[in-house]
Regions:
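Juxtamembrane helix-loop boundaries in multi-pass membrane proteins
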Residues: 43-63, 88, 114-128, 157, ...
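Alpha-helical transmembrane segments
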Residues: 8-22, 82-95, 126, 174-190, ...
Length: 382
């Protein structure tokens, strides 16, 4: 496998992890609606225990996503995670707060009360998807950073800082771009949609299911409007292309539309993903008995996000544009690890299907029985 193929292969794997992370944020979506889907303490505990079965999947995928980026594209890791640290610290803090809230809300000696920790889960359910969506949007809209490539390691002499943020906001400036917020809120509403569909499928309670069906309508409308608006914005906006020979980066009109036309199979994946998400939503709204909407909508989410991330990084495109210095923009060619590192990791990645198979098996084992009120009396309940 050539160096170029390895770069594309690892961009695909990182994109797949990112897509799975967005799907698994149904945990955050459901948690953001604890007080909306649950009308009393028992129903709220049902929702918390339902998402409590899966929150570790989301947290682990978030960490794995960051680790895969660090290993395969270390310059992005140091630039974004090291430069935009306020944005990423808030995201990580909200996820840590989630873990603490699950474990301590009903413990003996909890002086704050269960409702306080439930509100913390709601906070994570809002901030997590919103900020992650905004961070992903910077792949298309750019960020304010500078990469001093002359400061790379020169022989055995270590040079000063390679990448730095161009202002004192350290990532919070991403929230000042309206289009970053558009995708951020689109991901937030998508997480809520997936959360509703998951709870309807996982919790055996008619009151929660009926309430979820109603909430699904009010959540789907803003999601569709925001997502379509962002998609139109992306395909019509100027993109950032790089010359594979010289590495020079230039602005190209409607670059992302060209990517979808050139990489036609990515466009097909995007279309199939969108159709599956809409199918899962519409069928759940129309049918009174259908509770399996999480599966077509979940698979559609993975395909849609995967296609968007592939569009951002393939076909000689700068996946992390710099608004401060165009030539500092990051590509899969100038930000990746060495050929040896990518080759070794590619061999190890053969084990990924086995890990995914184990996750599917664990998921099936956990969900073999639908959650009901009887399980709240067990010692393992949150």
């Amino acid at each position: 496998m050539t160096y170029e193929c390895l770069q594309q292969y690892w961009w695909f794997l990182v994109s797949l992890l990112g897509a799975l992370l967005v799907f698994l944020m149904f945990v955050q979506g459901a948690n953001s609606m604890i007080f909306s889907l649950g009308s009393n303490e028992v129903e709220r505990r049902l929702i918390v225990n339902s998402t409590g079965r899966k929150w570790e999947f989301t947290f682990t995928t978030l960490v794995t996503f960051g680790g895969a980026f660090f290993a395969s594209f270390p310059l992005f890791y140091s630039t974004s995670f090291g430069g935009a640290y306020w944005l990423w610290m808030i995201i990580l803090f909200s996820f840590v707060l989630q873990a603490v809230s699950y474990e301590f809300q009903n413990k003996l000696g909890n002086l704050l009360g269960a409702r306080t920790f439930q509100r913390c889960l709601v906070l994570n359910g809002i901030l997590g998807p919103l900020l992650l969506g905004g961070a992903v949007a910077t792949f298309f809209n750019g960020s304010n950073f500078i990469v001093a490539k002359d400061n790379m390691v020169d022989g055995f002499e270590l040079q000063p800082v390679i990448s730095s943020w161009a202002n004192a906001s350290h990532g919070l400036d991403a929230l000042l771009d309206p289009w970053n917020l558009v995708l951020g809120f689109a991901v937030f509403f998508l997480a809520r949609i997936l959360g509703i569909l998951y709870v309807m499928n996982n919790v055996n309670d008619e009151n929660i299911r009926c309430r979820g069906s109603v909430r699904l309508v009010g959540t789907s409308v803003p999601f569709v409007v925001l997502f379509v608006a962002f998609l139109v914005h992306v395909v019509l906006k100027d993109g950032y292309a790089y010359d594979p020979v010289s590495g020079i980066i230039s602005i190209v009109p409607m670059k992302y539309l060209d990517n979808l036309l050139t990489l036609w199979w990515v466009a097909v994946v995007l279309l199939v993903g969108v159709v599956l998400v809409l199918y899962g939503i519409i069928r759940t709204i129309v049918s009174k008995t259908y509770i399996g909407g999480i599966w077509p909508a979940g698979i559609g989410t993975v395909l849609t996000v995967l296609a968007l991330l592939l569009t951002a990084g393939l076909n000689n495109t700068a996946y992390y544009p710099s608004n401060a210095d165009l030539q500092s923009s990051l590509t899969i060619a100038n930000s990746c690890s060495s050929e040896f590192t990518l080759s070794v990791m590619a061999v190890v990645s053969i084990l990924v299907p086995f890990v995914l198979a184990y996750i599917v098996y664990a998921w099936y084992s956990i969900d073999k029985k639908k959650l009901d009120k009887e399980e709240l009396s067990t010692g393992e309940a949150y």
